[in-house]
Amino acid sequence: MERVIAKHIHDHLQNNRLLSDMQHGFIRERSTCTNLFESMNDWTMSVTCKTGISVAYIDFSRAFDSVTHVILFACLHKYGIQGDLLRWLTKFFTGRTHQTRVGLSLSAVAELLSGVVQGSGIGPVLFLIYIDDLAKWLESHGITAKLFAECRRC
């Protein structure tokens, strides 16, 4: 079920060109290779035109776990994911709990207020929607960037 919904959302995003072109990974025909190719092209053009280049590599540790559900739901609505589908996604994430075991001890049960399910069919596309505002903010400030999302457990 998750993979069917993920494909539907993914198709909606691509058909309506809703995601920034800066994003690579989890998008058809936009991978580490296209990220590297575009970066090398940008750098070559900067050297040829004798303009400055600043490069920053940022690795968001545990990025999939940092997705705040309330913000994700607002992003989904903004991207046209509404009605029954948004209600299903809200129910999918609401009320999830976790508990930690260390040896024989168990922590208290706590509700998960952030994170997309890693290893699920739907986590990657939801992360793309969540992070896309960063790409659009960078674009609006004249900053060229290449974003790449990946999940080693997906």
Predicted region positions:
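Active-site palm subdomain of RNA-directed nucleic acid polymerases
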Residues: 5-23, 48, 125-154
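Short, conserved phosphate/pyrophosphate- and ester-handling motifs at nucleotide-, phospho-/glycolipid
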Residues: 119, 123
